[in-house]
From Swiss-Prot:
<dbReference type="GO" id="GO:0003924">
    <property type="term" value="F:GTPase activity"/>
</dbReference>
<dbReference type="InterPro" id="IPR027417">
    <property type="entry name" value="P-loop_NTPase"/>
</dbReference>
<dbReference type="InterPro" id="IPR036925">
    <property type="entry name" value="TIF_IF2_dom3_sf"/>
</dbReference>
<feature type="region of interest" description="G4">
    <location>
        <begin position="468"/>
        <end position="471"/>
    </location>
</feature>
<dbReference type="GO" id="GO:0005829">
    <property type="term" value="C:cytosol"/>
</dbReference>
<feature type="compositionally biased region" description="Basic residues">
    <location>
        <begin position="239"/>
        <end position="256"/>
    </location>
</feature>
<comment type="function">
    <text>One of the essential components for the initiation of protein synthesis. Protects formylmethionyl-tRNA from spontaneous hydrolysis and promotes its binding to the 30S ribosomal subunits. Also involved in the hydrolysis of GTP during the formation of the 70S ribosomal complex.</text>
</comment>
<dbReference type="Pfam" id="PF11987">
    <property type="entry name" value="IF-2"/>
</dbReference>
<keyword id="KW-0963">Cytoplasm</keyword>
<feature type="region of interest" description="G1">
    <location>
        <begin position="368"/>
        <end position="375"/>
    </location>
</feature>
<keyword id="KW-0547">Nucleotide-binding</keyword>
<dbReference type="Pfam" id="PF04760">
    <property type="entry name" value="IF2_N"/>
</dbReference>
<keyword id="KW-0342">GTP-binding</keyword>
<dbReference type="GO" id="GO:0005525">
    <property type="term" value="F:GTP binding"/>
</dbReference>
<dbReference type="InterPro" id="IPR000795">
    <property type="entry name" value="T_Tr_GTP-bd_dom"/>
</dbReference>
<comment type="similarity">
    <text>Belongs to the TRAFAC class translation factor GTPase superfamily. Classic translation factor GTPase family. IF-2 subfamily.</text>
</comment>
<feature type="binding site">
    <location>
        <begin position="368"/>
        <end position="375"/>
    </location>
    <ligand>
        <name>GTP</name>
    </ligand>
</feature>
Length: 858
């Protein structure tokens, strides 16, 4: 027999493959899935242990008994039908066309019943099919070739044949054995099948006799009685049933539609009215409908009944809204409008909030003169090398850092010490808690030291003096203390209240003592903040990054800032996209006293601006846009308009020469410092006109603006893009790049001085006395004389002096010695000269020669 797969054996046994696999594995066979193969012995062993499950069906004997009863009932009907057929054959006028339309249906039903039985029933099914074929042949013999048996149900016959073909090999064996039955048995089976078919036909379709006229097989007239209904010819009852079903379904559908249409519309449940209508003047019907939970049409109708005709978009005044609220029977309360553009009010409210206060880190600003060691001090505290990256060792912007000491955090702000950065130092003093004043022990008190003291006193901030560079040979800390007493900073050792710490930032000496003093001072101040409210603070610095866009260094003074917060910074707004701490790491939130760098603003804010976090993005956007409009209006107001009052001043300014300048810098603070310093340059007759300032690299737009306005571009810590550089070379635009601010200031000052009209000073070079005159026709009067003093030059100016009075001032037309033209004649030599356009020369006139020399601008 060979090997057999699991799914084949499962099909023969009529059991699921999973069940067969489980039983095979229990018997120890190596079976994995339904495609595994079994030997003959294994298959027989598995068949012996498998319980065959049959589908639910009625037992075969019941089917057989019903078929037998059907045969007994239809014997009489079959005999009558055969007699009728014989009468039609004798007359020859009609051709009897007996169609057993439902024969195959009966066979298919028998076949279906037999399929559910075991081997014996399958044999009967096959015998029944053969007997049906035999009945067709017998019927053909009885009709004598005149009657034609047509099978109208070929499809059913095909299905029954297909079912018979799909039997298993056992069925084929049984049917083969049944083919050896004798003819008598076949004829009996044929009769049974025929009667059964007739019975089924009569039972399903009834006795339906119909006459049909048409052409017969040989062209004659054909009258046939159709007993029983087939698929095509006896289907009147079937059509009637089908029509009835269609009518019923159509009626049911129409009835359902009527029921749906007849349903009453659902009653809309209105939300209850609010107890108080909180409104703002200028609301329309749509806005009021949302507040009152009513449709705008209802609001408009009510107002119309009250004598007010409006549409849903028309703004309503205060009286109309209050009348509407009274008609609804509720109170009306006008909402107080908060000016979202007033950031100072929001900032003060957030700062003055005393709920949920918690200790915060102190903010310390380091101030002092240039090169007194401020950045070096922070360098030692942070263990980094910031100074090496600064241009010329000068801090150009505020640096914000955090240092941990004894488990506590201190925030340091490093401010520039150069004179140009006054505004940046003032900002640092305003946002700080403690000021550390760094004074070099060898230099003592310098101008920016005094300025830092004044800033700290104006901000009412305590000062800790750090006397630096005590390691230098010429250091004199006591002299520094004596100098500072003149400005009210008296050391504690001398009976004052100012803390002095002598340090060496270069070698890290006494730095721990300085940090201890800072923490002690912060404990005295009792610094607290509310971390649970919206964040508020100040802008330390702002810049435009090519990859990040607008960036701003902020100091959070109140609340906690999170990534994604809607924020208004000065005249700009945005949503916090990223936050970076002083170590360059991204963070998700920032608590009070934390310096951070954020991105996500729509523009670059100004250094020193305040920022406030809003509850929603829409309010933040509205506030930012309104503040930007207000700033633009203020800028336009500052544009000077010529009136009769300022006409003379405008005329005087028109006489002044201007140096047009475009300033581009890396950060906003540097832009402010450079612009302020250039405006302070005092050169008589020339002034600086700054036409544009911005942060970021020098681009093509800057070059185009400079070319149109004939301006100079000053780049501070920035460089032009390659496209801008090429365009500047083409358009002959002057771009000056600097890294140290006072170099830029000196260069602009020199350019301004060079624009002045040159100043000339008269210098007398010599004198000559006229002793003889010669009048020559067509030439004029020639004077001959002697050089009595200095040198007479050919290109010098001359004056004719007679009796101490200047008679004429002009130029020499010619200068000769004897007959030769010469360039100059020195003292003690004779000369001959002719004055241009002047012939009234007389003896004893004095000719004074002079030149105009340019005086350099001081």
């Amino acid at each position: 027999m060979g090997k057999k797969r699991i799914y084949e054996l499962a099909k023969e046994l009529n059991v699921p493959s999973k069940q067969l696999i489980a039983q095979a594995q229990q018997l120890g066979f190596s079976v994995k899935n339904h495609m595994s193969t079994l030997g003959d012995s294994e298959a027989r062993q598995l068949q012996g242990t498998t319980t065959v499950t049959h589908p639910k069906s009625q037992p075969a004997p019941a089917k057989t008994s019903r078929a037998t009863q059907a045969v007994a009932k239809n014997v009489t009907r079959t005999a009558n039908q055969q007699q009728s057929n014989s009468r039609h054959q004798q007359s020859g006028d009609y051709l009897n066309n007996n169609r057993n339309n439902n024969q195959n249906n009966s066979q298919s039903r028998n076949s279906n019943g037999n399929r559910s039985n075991n081997g014996g029933n399958r044999t009967n099914s096959n015998n029944g099919n053969r007997s049906a074929n035999a009945s067709r042949s017998n019927s053909a013999r009885n009709n004598g070739g005149s009657n034609t048996n047509r099978s109208n149900n070929n499809n059913n016959n095909n299905r029954s044949n297909n079912n018979n073909r799909s039997n298993t090999s056992n069925n084929r064996t049984n049917s083969t054995g049944n083919r050896t039955n004798n003819g008598g048995q076949n004829r009996n089976n044929n009769r049974t099948t025929t009667n059964n078919n007739n019975n089924n036909s009569n039972r399903s379709n009834g006795s339906n006799n119909s006459s049909r006229n048409g052409s017969g097989r040989f062209g004659g007239s054909l009258n046939s009685n159709n007993n029983g209904g087939g698929r095509y010819r006896g289907g009147n009852n079937n059509n009637r049933r089908r029509n009835n079903r269609n009518n019923k379904s159509r009626n049911n559908k129409n009835q359902r539609i009527r029921q749906v249409n007849n349903k009453p519309a659902p009653v809309r449940k209105d939300k209850p009215l609010p107890e108080t209508l909180v409104y703002t003047v200028g609301m329309n019907a749509q806005d009021l409908g949302k507040l009152l939970h009513r449709e705008p049409a209802e609001i408009i109708k009510k107002l119309f009944m009250l004598g007010v005709a409006v549409n849903q978009n028309q703004s309503l005044d205060k009286d109309t809204i209050e009348i509407l609220a009274t008609d609804y029977g509720i109170n009306a309360q006008e909402k107080v409008q908060v000016d979202v553009t007033d950031l100072d009010k929001f900032f003060d409210d957030e700062v003055n909030n005393t709920d949920n206060l918690a200790p915060r880190a102190p903010v310390v600003t380091v101030m002092g003169h240039v090169d007194h060691g401020k950045t070096t001090l922070l360098d030692q505290l942070r263990h980094t090398h910031v100074t090496e990256g600064e241009a010329g060792g000068i801090t150009q912007a505020i640096g914000a850092y955090q240092v941990k000491h004894d488990g506590k955090v201190i925030t340091f702000l490093d401010t520039p010490g150069h004179a140009a950065f006054t505004e940046m130092r003032a900002r640092g003093a305003d946002i700080t808690d403690i000021t550390v004043l760094v004074v070099a022990a060898d230099d003592g008190v310098m101008p920016q030291t005094i300025e830092a003291i004044n800033h700290a006193k104006a901000a009412k901030v305590p000062i800790i003096v750090a006397v630096n560079k005590i390691d230098k040979p010429g250091a004199n800390p006591n002299h520094v203390m004596e100098q500072l007493t003149e400005y009210g900073l008296i050391p504690e050792d001398w009976g004052g209240d100012t803390i002095f710490v002598q340090i060496s930032a270069k070698f890290g000496k006494n730095l721990d003592e300085l940090l201890d003093m800072i923490l002690l001072q912060s404990e005295v101040l009792e610094l607290t903040a509310n971390p649970k409210q919206n964040a508020a603070g100040s802008v330390l610095e702002a810049s435009l990054d090519r990859g990040k866009g607008s960036t701003a260094t902020l100091l959070v003074q109140q609340g906690t800032m999170h990534v994604g917060d809607p924020i208004v910074v000065g005249n700009t707004y945005g949503k916090v996209r990223t936050m970076t701490n002083d170590h360059g790491k991204r963070i998700k939130e920032a608590v009070p006293s934390t310096p951070i760098e954020i991105t996500g603003l729509n523009d670059v804010p100004d250094a020193g601006d305040r920022f406030v976090v809003f509850d929603d993005e829409k309010t933040a956007r509205d506030a930012g846009e309104q503040r930007a409009k207000q700033a633009l209006m203020e800028e336009r107001k500052q544009t000077a308009h010529v009136t009769l009052d300022n006409l003379f001043d405008s005329m005087k300014q028109g006489e002044l020469k201007e140096v047009d300048v475009i300033i581009k810098a890396d950060v906003q603070g540097s832009v402010e410092a450079l612009a302020g310093s250039l405006r302070k340059i005092d050169v008589e007759g020339v002034r600086v006109n700054i036409i544009h300032t911005a942060v970021g690299a020098i681009n093509e737009s800057d070059v185009a603006l400079a070319e149109a306005s004939n301006a100079i571009i000053i780049g501070f810590n920035v460089r032009p893009t390659p496209q801008a550089k090429a365009q500047a070379d083409t358009d002959d635009v002057d771009i000056r790049l600097h890294q140290v601010i006072y170099n830029a200031i000196d260069e602009i000052e020199s350019a301004m001085k060079g624009m002045l009209e040159p100043t000339y000073k008269e210098e007398i070079t010599g004198q000559a006395e006229i002793r003889e005159i010669y009048k020559v026709s067509k030439i004029g009067t020639i004077g001959g004389g002697m050089v009595t003093d200095g040198v007479i030059h050919r290109d010098s100016g001359v004056r004719v002096i007679r009796d101490g009075v200047v008679i004429y001032d002009g130029k020499l037309a010619s200068l000769r010695r004897f007959k030769d033209d010469v360039k100059e004649v020195k003292q003690g030599f004779e000369l001959g000269l002719r004055i241009e356009d002047y012939n009234d020369i007389k003896v004893n006139d004095v000719i004074e020669a002079y030149v105009m020399k340019e005086v350099p601008v001081e």
